Swiss-Prot record:
It comes from Arabidopsis thaliana (Mouse-ear cress). InterPro entries: Scorpion_toxin-like (IPR003614), Scorpion_toxin-like_sf (IPR036574), Scorpion_toxinL/defensin (IPR002061). Changing residue 8 to F: In strain: cv. Cvi-1, cv. Fe-1a, cv. Goe-0, cv. Ita-0, cv. Nd-1 and cv. Wei-0. GO terms for molecular function: sodium channel inhibitor activity. Belongs to the DEFL family. Protease inhibitor I18 (RTI/MTI-2) subfamily. This is Defensin-like protein 197. Disulfide bonds join 33-86, 46-70, 55-81, 59-83. The lineage of its organism: Eukaryota, Viridiplantae, Streptophyta, Embryophyta, Tracheophyta. One of its GO terms (cellular component) is extracellular region. Keywords: Antimicrobial, Disulfide bond, Fungicide, Plant defense, Secreted, Signal.
Length: 89
């Protein structure tokens, strides 16, 4: 009887261990925080004289993001708008 009890406990333990979910990765391909709005948006889209910028307004209005940020690339002099779905800066 004791052998059966030990066997049953070990069997249940292994079932629980095998059915435990795997670790959840912090970075998931299904959801990415920052996504490019689309191509070279130009200087008027990211004009710092207007707050909030058109980049931020359009990301919030049309893309459902929490915020938007402009990034200027020094070599090519292109301005890109990135929509942020995780935080509002």
């Amino acid at each position: 009887m004791k052998f059966v009890s030990v066997f049953l406990v070990l069997f249940i333990f292994f079932l629980v261990v095998l059915e435990a979910p795997e670790k959840i990765e912090a970075k998931d391909d299904k959801f990415i925080c920052v996504v490019e709005y689309g191509g070279d948006v130009g200087p008027t889209f990211c004009n710092p004289k207007f707050f909030p910028t058109l980049c931020r307004q359009n990301c919030r209005s049309f893309k459902g993001a929490k915020g938007g940020k402009c990034v200027k690339q020094p070599k090519h002099k292109h301005i890109k708008c990135f929509c942020d779905y995780c935080k509002d800066d």
